[in-house]
Amino acid sequence: MENTSTNGEPARAEKSIGRLHVLTDFHLQQDRSHAELARLAIRGGADTIQFRQKHGGIQNKLLEARKVATVCADASTPLLIDDHLDIAQATDADGVHLGQDDFPIDAARSVLGPSPIIGGTASKPHEAAEAYEQGADYIGFGPVFPTTSKRNPKSVKGPDGLADACEAVPIPVIAIGGITHDRVRSVLEAGAHGVAVLSAVDTARNPEQATARFRAAIDGVLREADS
């Protein structure tokens, strides 16, 4: 018999969502490949890798994503593909992350089925709620702080805006945008499940150490909360 939620709809299976998402990018820096960034981030404690490549042809994206998929599979670390359902399927990734202007979440769920992780992007609480209703497993919310990784970032939301988004949905919210080691505590205390980082790791002199500092900051806050 199919499990149902309180509103009579099929119950959504809870999935394990990581707390430290590292996005790999070859646009902000060209010193390290996606695969190398993924390897270093995982060694530093990242529990989710998100392949993000906004530029270039589909064949090049697929080639790079396959290399990252190998790294993640060897380390038993979940891999999410930014934007591209086709690449996610071709690489047997664990899921996708979809922006506001990407493939609709409900359509993606129909294509991918119930098992893969689908993350949705939101910059307002009502957008987070809409993504949840469409079938998202987690919300990437931001920018929480000023960020240089996007040319025209939407208005900064701050910890208070993040808290509103966390209250709007019953699924994990991942804070993104200008996240630094020193800001981890404020976003977790606002209700975020975890953080997603890009330039703070990808452009760091030592991505592994940068990731490890994020891991330590997250774990430290969680330990305090449990004590």
Swiss-Prot record:
<dbReference type="InterPro" id="IPR036206">
    <property type="entry name" value="ThiamineP_synth_sf"/>
</dbReference>
<dbReference type="InterPro" id="IPR034291">
    <property type="entry name" value="TMP_synthase"/>
</dbReference>
<keyword id="KW-0460">Magnesium</keyword>
<dbReference type="GO" id="GO:0000287">
    <property type="term" value="F:magnesium ion binding"/>
</dbReference>
<dbReference type="GO" id="GO:0009229">
    <property type="term" value="P:thiamine diphosphate biosynthetic process"/>
</dbReference>
<comment type="function">
    <text>Condenses 4-methyl-5-(beta-hydroxyethyl)thiazole monophosphate (THZ-P) and 2-methyl-4-amino-5-hydroxymethyl pyrimidine pyrophosphate (HMP-PP) to form thiamine monophosphate (TMP).</text>
</comment>
<keyword id="KW-0808">Transferase</keyword>
<feature type="binding site">
    <location>
        <position position="82"/>
    </location>
    <ligand>
        <name>4-amino-2-methyl-5-(diphosphooxymethyl)pyrimidine</name>
    </ligand>
</feature>
<dbReference type="GO" id="GO:0004789">
    <property type="term" value="F:thiamine-phosphate diphosphorylase activity"/>
</dbReference>
<feature type="binding site">
    <location>
        <position position="83"/>
    </location>
    <ligand>
        <name>Mg(2+)</name>
    </ligand>
</feature>
<feature type="binding site">
    <location>
        <begin position="50"/>
        <end position="54"/>
    </location>
    <ligand>
        <name>4-amino-2-methyl-5-(diphosphooxymethyl)pyrimidine</name>
    </ligand>
</feature>
<keyword id="KW-0784">Thiamine biosynthesis</keyword>
<feature type="binding site">
    <location>
        <position position="150"/>
    </location>
    <ligand>
        <name>4-amino-2-methyl-5-(diphosphooxymethyl)pyrimidine</name>
    </ligand>
</feature>
<feature type="binding site">
    <location>
        <begin position="198"/>
        <end position="199"/>
    </location>
    <ligand>
        <name>2-[(2R,5Z)-2-carboxy-4-methylthiazol-5(2H)-ylidene]ethyl phosphate</name>
    </ligand>
</feature>
<feature type="binding site">
    <location>
        <position position="178"/>
    </location>
    <ligand>
        <name>2-[(2R,5Z)-2-carboxy-4-methylthiazol-5(2H)-ylidene]ethyl phosphate</name>
    </ligand>
</feature>
<feature type="binding site">
    <location>
        <position position="121"/>
    </location>
    <ligand>
        <name>4-amino-2-methyl-5-(diphosphooxymethyl)pyrimidine</name>
    </ligand>
</feature>
<dbReference type="GO" id="GO:0005737">
    <property type="term" value="C:cytoplasm"/>
</dbReference>
<comment type="similarity">
    <text>Belongs to the thiamine-phosphate synthase family.</text>
</comment>
<dbReference type="Pfam" id="PF02581">
    <property type="entry name" value="TMP-TENI"/>
</dbReference>
<dbReference type="InterPro" id="IPR022998">
    <property type="entry name" value="ThiamineP_synth_TenI"/>
</dbReference>
<keyword id="KW-0479">Metal-binding</keyword>
<feature type="binding site">
    <location>
        <begin position="147"/>
        <end position="149"/>
    </location>
    <ligand>
        <name>2-[(2R,5Z)-2-carboxy-4-methylthiazol-5(2H)-ylidene]ethyl phosphate</name>
    </ligand>
</feature>
<protein>
    <recommendedName>
        <fullName>Thiamine-phosphate synthase</fullName>
        <ecNumber>2.5.1.3</ecNumber>
    </recommendedName>
</protein>
<dbReference type="GO" id="GO:0009228">
    <property type="term" value="P:thiamine biosynthetic process"/>
</dbReference>
<comment type="pathway">
    <text>Cofactor biosynthesis; thiamine diphosphate biosynthesis; thiamine phosphate from 4-amino-2-methyl-5-diphosphomethylpyrimidine and 4-methyl-5-(2-phosphoethyl)-thiazole: step 1/1.</text>
</comment>
<dbReference type="InterPro" id="IPR013785">
    <property type="entry name" value="Aldolase_TIM"/>
</dbReference>
<feature type="binding site">
    <location>
        <position position="102"/>
    </location>
    <ligand>
        <name>Mg(2+)</name>
    </ligand>
</feature>
